[in-house]
Amino acid sequence: MLEIKNISVAFDRPILNDISFAAKRGQIIGLVGRSGAGKSTLLNVISGQLGPQHGIVLLDNDILPNPEQLLVPGYDEIKLVSQDYNLDPYHTVEENIREAAMSLPEKSKIRRVEALLKLLKLNDIRDVKANETSGGEQQRLSIARAIALKPKVLLLDEPFSNLDSQLRALLFRYILRLREEEDLTIILVSHEGQDVLGLSDAIYFLNNGKLSARKTPFNAYYQLNHLGNAQLLGIVNQTNHNGEKIRFRPDEYEVKENGMLSLDFDYYVFLGTQYLNYFSGTKNEIIILSSTVPFKTDIQIDINRKRQNRKQTRTTPKKANKR
């Protein structure tokens, strides 16, 4: 288990303030926050690259020492994939991975290097020097180096930023498989809501150097009532006065040229009286009056009006066929 206890860091101003959380073996923890919230600083503390003014980091009940100390046992089992890549620019792609796997027996090292070259689609550039590769290729190479020795804890600081959709999906599957097979603990920092929601077992929100909330992906999607946190995940924030909530992802709505907000569903949902807070630069509160029975909807909401009453078509409570 990875445990973060009462971590505080300050430079010219407080960056992290009394941060505490735990991640069990095999868990993936998502960490989200705005730029400057302290996410990368926290990863640097966990990886041992930065010593906190206060607090400790524990791995399997062993306290990990500050980086100022000469001996740092345990940090070989915590690997950070930063946004700086940390590659040897004058060595080839294959040599960079081989160096990261240096402590493995020779046969195991060869198999591991070949597997990583194939996994992250680096085989075609295996003989190219790192400083001659693209940003996306350097990102993938950095990930390959980090997981070469199969660490207990993997820290990912915006790891998918330079990967195309196919490589993102491939890396998603590999991370999940590695977590299951080796009980790998992963701390994921990302500005992309889909990364956090798609991979995480728990999501922490970092605001002004403090952890403001902890949510499961389900609760973050359906029951998150903090506007700022909802925006970080790319979710339009909505609630109603009865406490019922429903959420629309960005790919489920669009604003028409006539100023109408189109919400398009291919399934049945329950709605009471919903207060929809739609944000497009300004806050527009719209009350939608509807039946409490399920309905299939492709509704048009006039975001230029404060209130719109709409009668919904009643249907039987079953799922609609997906289009």
Task: Give a label for each model feature.
Residues K129-T133, E137:
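Conserved ABC ATPase signature
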Residues I63-K79, S103:
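ABC ATPase NBD coupling module
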Residues S47:
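Helix-to-loop junction immediately C-terminal to a conserved catalytic motif
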Residues N208-G209:
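Conserved ABC ATPase "signature" C-loop
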